[in-house]
Curated annotation (Swiss-Prot):
GO terms for biological process: phosphate-containing compound metabolic process. One of its GO terms (molecular function) is magnesium ion binding. Belongs to the PPase family. This is Soluble inorganic pyrophosphatase.
């Protein structure tokens, strides 16, 4: 058909001829592996005090999303059995490792909810020691480092008490209807949170080195 063999748009076509960008062609010719948010995302130059974190669960959600370790995608783990919702954005810190085999958990205080799978810069302000069904499951309490309403906070003692009580009550109650017991201890200051993150970074590094030796 006239116009097709010479690469021009047919007469009467509403669309211009497609221009094939060399960068697009080169990207199509290569095999790509999707980046894994736990292992491929940098923790950030300011870590352990200021760090990147990946949000799994947005504030106000009743759905518990979590990282699927095999694929690096965010999957639906379950819908909470009770009527409570996550009080703040919740996720994990990349390139960290805890004794339970998971990355370090973090709860990020900020003005808005954000979508699962995005990452943001956070500042550690405290540590919430927690025991989940007899196992240690501590949470870092942080603020969004790029939120003008929260970025000035440096320690958990600066957060209004009712906010901390809201966080405590959520984690104490969100598994009750599943007949699972969770105990939350007293909040600890920013120094303890930073030390916990540093330890999890070291543990991750040691694990990677050990894996390379095998």
């Amino acid at each position: 058909m006239a116009g097709e063999a010479d690469g021009k748009a047919p007469l009467g076509s509403r669309y211009p001829p497609a221009a094939l960008n060399e960068r697009i062609l080169s990207s199509m010719s290569q095999k790509h592996v999707a980046a894994h948010p736990w292992h491929d995302l940098e923790i950030g130059p300011g870590a352990p005090a200021v760090f990147n974190c990946v949000v799994e669960i947005p504030r106000g959600s009743k759905v518990k999303y979590e990282l699927d370790k095999a694929t690096g995608l965010i999957k639906v783990d379950r819908v909470l059995y009770s009527s409570v919702v996550y009080p703040h954005n919740y996720g994990f810190i990349p390139r960290t490792l805890c004794e339970d085999g998971d990355p370090m958990d973090v709860l990020v205080l900020m003005q808005e909810q954000v979508v699962p799978g995005c990452f943001l810069r956070a500042r550690a302000i405290g540590l919430m020691p927690m025991i989940d069904q007899g196992e240690k499951d501590d949470k870092i309490i942080a603020v969004c480092a790029d939120d003008p309403e929260y970025r000035h906070f440096r320690d958990i003692k600066e957060i209004p008490p009712h906010r901390l009580q809201e966080i405590r009550r959520f984690f104490e109650d969100y598994k009750k209807n599943e007949n699972k017991e969770v105990a939350v201890n007293e909040f600890l200051p920013a120094e303890d949170a930073i030390n916990a993150i540093k330890y999890s970074m070291d543990l991750y590094g040691a694990y990677i080195i050990e894996s390379l030796r095998k």
